[in-house]
């Protein structure tokens, strides 16, 4: 069944767990995400980036995910990830997205507040929840690129004012994570003190972007079959758990799914060179994604919460 992020994250905040927001761009990824959550009876947020919408077409993507969500035995939210174009946000709402993100983090604070208020007013009028972002992440993923020098952490004072003025439903905060597979040059150093202060001062559920763990075994497997991902490094699982204990209720995961898919498809093609059935080839990637998603559900503590 289709629900909103607000509903899922409010329950997560009360229950002290987090919901996974997993990015999709095709049928097989969506199938894997939903199947994993059904098996573990967990609610899920299926996230779609601007580039995924461009890749599939908004009508196709909307119809596919909504149909699967309505047939699912668990609560599913269809969410626009990193929406920066007001017109696209409008289109997503009209095509049945139950939650949208307005990412005005690239703009000065006053401008971010203004555009977020505009989106909130429109979305709330039709029962769609709104995620906003304050502070910036480094790294590259899809159409989001932020130089390390530009990246900045969320200021607690600004966060308190921002939520009060915009009335957004959830807030994505920057505490040191980044997009993509190369998140840290050394050890991960997340700003947990800052997160705790923000969580104490604002009333809405919090979101952590750039939270893939970049599983070493999957990197090793991918490299074994021809990939070149030597320096890939993600957020440690222990840090994810600590962030949840400090108020994070939505954890965005995309890179880990891409890596799992790539590693397993590479393995399949090498081990079965005589197979040319696209369904079998892609099916190997789908199963790998499903297993990774199941491990994330356990990490986030949302198994059995549907």
Positions of PLM-derived features:
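Alpha/beta enzyme core
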Residues: 5-11, 26-52, 58-75, 83-205, ...
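C-terminal alpha-helical cap/extension of soluble enzyme domains
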Residues: 224, 235-306
């Amino acid at each position: 069944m289709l629900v909103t992020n607000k509903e899922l994250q409010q329950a997560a905040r009360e229950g002290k767990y987090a919901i996974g927001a997993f990015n999709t761009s095709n049928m097989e990824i969506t199938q894997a995400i939903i199947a994993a959550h059904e098996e573990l009876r967990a609610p899920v947020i299926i996230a779609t980036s601007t580039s995924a919408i461009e890749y599939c077409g908004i009508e196709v993507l909307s119809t596919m995910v909504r149909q699967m969500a309505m047939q699912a035995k668990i609560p599913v939210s269809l969410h626009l990830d990193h929406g920066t174009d007001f017109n696209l946000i409008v289109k997503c709402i009209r095509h049945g997205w139950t939650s949208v993100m307005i990412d005005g983090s690239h703009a000065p604070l006053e401008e971010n507040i203004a555009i977020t208020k505009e989106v909130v007013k429109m979305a709330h009028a039709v029962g769609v929840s709104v995620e906003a972002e304050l502070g910036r992440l480094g790294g590259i993923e899809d159409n989001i690129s932020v130089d390390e020098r530009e990246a900045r952490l969320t200021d607690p004072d600004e966060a308190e004012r921002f939520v009060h003025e915009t009335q957004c439903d959830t807030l994505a905060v920057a505490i040191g994570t980044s997009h993509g597979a190369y998140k840290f040059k050394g050890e991960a150093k997340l700003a947990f003190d800052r997160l705790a202060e923000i969580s104490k001062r604002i009333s809405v559920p919090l979101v952590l972007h750039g939270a893939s763990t970049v599983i070493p075994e999957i990197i090793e497997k991918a490299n074994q079959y021809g990939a070149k991902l030597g320096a890939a490094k993600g957020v440690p699982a222990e840090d994810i758990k600590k962030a949840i204990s400090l108020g994070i209720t939505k954890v965005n995961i995309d890179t880990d799914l891409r890596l799992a898919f790539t590693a397993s498809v590479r393995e399949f093609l090498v081990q079965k060179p005589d197979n040319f059935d696209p369904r079998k080839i892609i099916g190997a990637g789908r199963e790998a994604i499903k297993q990774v998603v199941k491990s994330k559900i356990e990490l986030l503590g949302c198994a059995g919460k549907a």
